[in-house]
Amino acid sequence: MDLSEYGINNVTDVIRNPSFEVLFEEETKPGLEGYEKGIVTELGAVSVDTGIFTGRSPKDKFIVKDDTTRDTLWWADQGKNDNKAIDQKVWNELKVLVTKQLSGKRLFVVDGYCGTNPDTRLCIRVITEVAWQAHFVKNMFIRPTEEELASFKPDFVVMNGAKCTNEKWEEQGLNSENFTVFNLTEKMQLIGGTWYGGEMKKGMFAMMNYFLPLQGIASMHCSANMGENGDVAVFFGLSGTGKTTLSTDPKRALIGDDEHGWDDNGVFNFEGGCYAKTINLSKEAEPDIYNAIRRDALLENVTVRADGAIDFDDNSKTENTRVSYPIYHIENIVKPVSKGGHANKVIFLSADAFGVLPPVSKLTPAQTKYHFLSGFTAKLAGTERGITEPTPTFSACFGNAFLTLHPTQYAEVLVKRMEAAGAEAYLVNTGWNGTGKRISIQDTRAIIDAILNGSIDNAETKEMPIFNLEVPTSLPGVNPEILDPRDTYTDPLQWESKAQDLATRFINNFEKYTDTTEGAELVAAGPQLD
């Protein structure tokens, strides 16, 4: 295979689209050292160490500003995001660096699809010198058939030079000697200095987030599943809100756990695998994910003892321990292709640590746009004296880190798709209330059931002040005392004080959208203070 068209020369050998069997042998063979080395665990899955980068490095992400992107991309100087600009000259220098690193080596080339829809999918080619990175790509992207591989033509190329270091970073105006950079004219991603596999996965998600909405297709950071009658639900939510847990439901088949599109035919997965967190994983609490960790799965940054036993509770390396596996490692999935019809339920998950939001409320179309653009969740951060103060996070479209267009473009496309399908939106709080405890998973699952089986639409409701949300007064299987968060406080004035605090944060965050007529009009759909 000739890789000279990419600037890679004198390659000693190319292992093209290796099988899982070949990858297992390559990543565990004797003589491998450092971060290239895979360890076989007692569950049969290989475990690797990704070095100092145990997560994405958003500060090292840059995109070439040229005629393609200048007027379409949502740049870092236009809003709080990671889309920092570089010029063609810096790109050329980084490309030389990566191609030099890969030239003269034995390389792995993996071809795959991003997106199950043949009309809009990206044909991805990843070139790397590290076997386990090739394995990660094979797990996470959609695996073409032998027939498809025979005529495969990439329309996006990822060159992963994890072993190279950029010593000229300061004069180039970059953040460090590591880089993850994109060129949308050349349709290429270059990676240098970081070994973290997620840079390839989320890099392609950012590209789908650019190309699809410009074609009127929703591109979503969400999980999706399908009921026995073919009804589809999508779950938006930031990390820790329950996106994976709640969409993995024995009564429903999984379409995907993280990245989806919504076009004229319905909802479709971008990926061929899952990338699950494994910190504190147990067979009892999450049997589906635990049972997916077997041969062909790839663990990252977990602690493996000498006998191959895995300590899932050990966070000494990172809280962000992960496993990637092909989607068919989950038993109850939509087959043969990870796609469904149009969604009729859209669920926004928020873990509110302020104890203000109701466990569930049905949203109007204007509220849907408002809460989608706000993308709110909150965490409890412990302080030295044991006092816990909630930390709010507002992440536009529940995926700010991966947006390449202005957030309003995603909201517009999503709402159009929802209106055409007659879909309803719901805000579900999986966080805390006035009792100081987190809303139980049993109550949250019963709420999700009520949304999916339609019983919530027949429930009596009342309006909650300040946030003006419509709240049901009773739902099957849900403790009625929690449905109005005010009832969980001994003194309702406590709720009101917290609600005013949170409302102020929502209002301040939304100010960035009020420079347009539509954004200014949406203010009325958010919380109101007298």
UniProtKB/Swiss-Prot annotation:
EC number: 4.1.1.49
SUPFAM superfamilies attached to this UniProt entry: PEP carboxykinase N-terminal domain (SSF68923), PEP carboxykinase-like (SSF53795)
PANTHER family tied to this protein: PHOSPHOENOLPYRUVATE CARBOXYKINASE (ATP), PHOSPHOENOLPYRUVATE CARBOXYKINASE ATP
One Gene Ontology cellular component annotation held by this UniProt entry: cytosol
Biological source species: Photobacterium profundum (strain SS9)
GO molecular-function terms, A-Z: ATP binding; metal ion binding; phosphoenolpyruvate carboxykinase (ATP) activity
Protein name: Phosphoenolpyruvate carboxykinase (ATP)
Residues holding substrate: R56, Y196, K202, R322
Keywords: ATP-binding, Cytoplasm, Decarboxylase, Gluconeogenesis, Lyase, Manganese, Metal-binding, Nucleotide-binding
Keyword DNA-binding appears in the UniProt entry: no
PROSITE patterns: PEPCK_ATP
Keyword Nucleotide-binding among record annotations: yes
Pathway: Carbohydrate biosynthesis; gluconeogenesis
Single biological process term from Gene Ontology: gluconeogenesis
Assembly and interaction partners: Monomer.
